[in-house]
Amino acid sequence: MVVAPYLAVAIGGSLGAMSRYLVTIMAQNAWGIKFPYGTLLVNTLGSFLAGFFLIVLVGRFSAEESFRLFLFTGFLGAFTTFSSFAAESLFMFEQGYWFKLITNILVNNVGSLSMVFVGTLVAKYVLLGHQGSN
């Protein structure tokens, strides 16, 4: 058994989970707890980073498998959180917070998908900018 892939995922996951917790606490301190801003922020930021690094590390620079496992499966897998999104949405449903529920579902889904796309565009722009200066 090769330990490196498991270790890469474990370290990335640990850092991603701690980062998610930190971002969530910062969002609660900044905007309060009436809406799950922390979950929205980690999901959209994580989606942007996934799109960006998909182009930069996988498409352009062919990053090592262990680093891809560290970043995508470990860090971004733990940083973003579909389970928290689902649980918070269920709570809003059970409480009858219909506007918050619909907003949460739409903004998380549309926002996350959009941010993956924006991340790929930014990465391509950055790469083309570097190619043009050579």
UniProtKB/Swiss-Prot annotation:
Gene Ontology MF, one: metal ion binding
Location, primary (coarse class): membrane
Subcellular location: Cell inner membrane
Residues annotated for Na(+) binding in this entry: 77, 80
Annotated keywords: Cell inner membrane, Cell membrane, Ion channel, Ion transport, Membrane, Metal-binding, Sodium, Transmembrane, Transmembrane helix, Transport
Regulation: Na(+) is not transported, but it plays an essential structural role and its presence is essential for fluoride channel function.
Keyword Lyase attached: no
GO-annotated biological processes: cellular detoxification of fluoride
Membrane topology type: Multi-pass membrane protein
GO annotation, cellular component aspect: plasma membrane
Enzymatic reactions: fluoride(in) = fluoride(out)
Role: Fluoride-specific ion channel. Important for reducing fluoride concentration in the cell, thus reducing its toxicity.
The protein's name: Fluoride-specific ion channel FluC
Gene: fluC
